From Swiss-Prot:
Lineage: Bacteria, Bacillati, Bacillota, Bacilli, Lactobacillales
Record family assignment: Belongs to the UPF0473 family.
Pfam short name (any one): DUF1292
Superkingdom to which the source organism belongs: Bacteria
Signal peptide: none
Organism, scientific name: Streptococcus agalactiae serotype Ia (strain ATCC 27591 / A909 / CDC SS700)
Protein name: UPF0473 protein SAK_2028
Length: 105
């Protein structure tokens, strides 16, 4: 998912930062762009991430990664899971919330 970032960049964004570790043990820092509560509809939550310090490409877009997660019994956030590409209902909901988020920016 890429998004066209057409708003003023002279203001500061204060995003939480997390580190993701890939299957090879490589760590990558990401900023949390948005979290979505999808528990009522899908039984899980979602998070949209951008690489920390990411710059827009020539088209003014930044690559966004989306994951789902469920809360652990103790209330902490569980492991991030990729969202299945064929889960149209989930992707439609994420896109709708994300577009609303962009409209508010």
């Amino acid at each position: 998912m890429a998004h066209n970032h057409n708003h003023d960049h002279n203001h500061e964004h204060q995003h939480e930062v997390i580190t993701l570790v890939d299957e090879n043990g490589n760590e990558t820092l990401f900023e949390i762009l948005l979290t979505i509560d999808g528990r009522e509809e899908f039984g899980k939550n979602y998070v949209l991430l951008i690489p920390a310090g990411a710059e827009e490409d020539e088209q003014g877009e930044i690559e966004i990664q989306a994951y789902s997660f469920t809360e652990n019994a103790d209330g902490t956030e569980g492991d991030l899971q990729p969202i299945p590409e064929d889960s149209d209902a989930e992707w439609d909901m994420i896109e709708e919330v994300f577009n609303s988020f962009l409209d508010e920016e």
